[in-house]
Curated annotation (Swiss-Prot):
Expressed by the venom gland. Residues 1-59 form the LCN-type CS-alpha/beta domain. This is Beta-insect excitatory toxin OdTx12. Could be considered as a biological insecticide candidate, when fused to Galanthus nivalis agglutinin (GNA), a protein with the potential to cross the insect gut. This chimeric OdTx12/GNA variant shows a gain in toxicity against insects when administered orally, while maintaining similar effects as the wild-type toxin when injected (toxic to insects and non-toxic to mammals). Pfam families: Toxin_3. GO terms for cellular component: extracellular region. CDD domains: neurotoxins_LC_scorpion (cd23106).
């Protein structure tokens, strides 16, 4: 499940970053497994309902 946005939009270079920073006021955002993945949200709300294994995969993929 993504926060708005369809899969093709996710693949655009700045789509997720814009979505995360402008809409959710996060520090930055990335596309991971065809959904936007936000880092550094200002409040503790979850933008994505995402499984632990998928979160680990996204963290690992984005950081490395």
């Amino acid at each position: 499940q993504s926060t708005g946005g369809k899969a093709p939009e996710c693949l655009l270079s700045n789509y997720c970053n814009n979505e995360c920073t402008k809409v959710h006021y996060a520090d930055k955002g990335y596309c991971c497994l065809l959904s936007c993945y936000c880092f550094g949200l200002s409040d503790d709300k979850k933008v994505l309902e995402i499984s632990d294994s998928r979160k680990k995969y996204c963290d690992y993929t984005i950081i490395n």
